[in-house]
Amino acid sequence: LGKYSSIIIFDPVPAKMRDYCKISKELKSDGSNVAGVLCALAPEEKKKVEALVSSYVRPLSERDINKVISEPVSLIKSDAMLYCYEDWNPEQPVDARGMSDGTLRFIAIVVALLAVAPHSLLLIEEVDNGLHPSRAKELVDMLKDLSRQRQVDVLCTTHNPVLLDELGNKMIPFVSYVTRDENGDSHVNLLEEKENLTKLMASGTIGRMMVNDKI
């Protein structure tokens, strides 16, 4: 762990993201001030980051979101709110209160990957929580893409077999699973070291192994 410049535990809470938040340069661990972090950026940088966030969210949503922005609110412009624009009503912005939990968590994770320092370790529990299973590919692609660009390692937990399947066999060396012994103690195991892994993989995917209680 000494190789990392920082270790961040990130667990975005959509309910908190729907409130107004203070404009701030530091992202909170619950993602509640995503809008404030975006608003704290210099104008040109803000446009670039919002465009990048939008590009990852665009293929994600069933509501056809084409743009995600953050804007200051109140008379003194000290607070911020997250907004999106949808294809079916492009002139009418929708604030965070009208966005789904899955979309808000996804936005928060994108912003977190852009906000943390290079060579950090970002830990995200139940990374796909609130996201429709059909969007697992978009989530995996985003995590791979941004972590590579930003030189950030990402450690995620999930109970979703669809997400595990989307990882593909090339990611097996990076997958671990947790078991309990007869004393109730938990143990983290590398998937690639599992006995009879080749035989198990011949009869199904990683997700199927999980569903069948093989891992």
Predicted regions and their residues:
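C-terminal lobe/lid and adjacent interdomain/linker elements of RecA-like ASCE P-loop ATPase modules
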Residues: 138-215
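Alpha-helical structural signal
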Residues: 100-103, 136, 160
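Phosphate-coordinating catalytic segments in nucleotide- and nucleic-acid-processing enzymes
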Residues: 1-117, 207-215
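Motif I (Walker A/P-loop) of helicase-class P-loop NTPases
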Residues: 108, 136-139
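Walker B catalytic acidic pair
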Residues: 125-126
